């Protein structure tokens, strides 16, 4: 098996579903012997990411400002230096910055571009980048249908539905009700 370098792009690592999925994918990549790199403005989840063996590169690619465009050249350099095989964009502005960075690389050196559509963003040219990955992951069949309806130029063969799961250790199947709360409810009725 060839060791891959997968670079995930997102605005920040504070909290939320996109961030949790980013950490889970990075952890799975590292455990499988691959190199996981996350590019974001940082946040409280960076220590957890790095504890998994993944790398974090601080670059504010999610700030909605014309000044964010200055990061394109640095991201392009970073993708070359890390030997990125796959660039996985998880949010709109990071996807645009990533796409512009990739377009500046020779085709033979250009990593593959993957996007994940996590939600139903308002249809627009700005949002369309999320449907323009060489592969686009949709987190549900509803998201897939939404992408095809609002971006009809999207090739359905490029879309893959990969539903979000849960960590069964964090959310065990068996209920574990609070005994005091249960006793209170039983006593009340």
Question: Which positions does each model-derived feature cover?
Answer:
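N-terminal strand-loop element at the rim of the active site
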Residues: 3, 8-70, 77, 158
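Short beta-strand scaffold positions
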Residues: 36-41, 88-89, 138-139, 161
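An amphipathic, basic-hydrophobic alpha-helix
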Residues: 62-86, 96-104, 128, 183
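Short His-centered aromatic/hydrophobic patch
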Residues: 89-95, 117
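A conserved, positively charged/aromatic
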Residues: 107-141, 153
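Carbohydrate-associated surface elements
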Residues: 142, 165
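A short helix/loop element that forms part of the nucleotide-sugar donor recognition site in Leloir-type
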Residues: 172-189
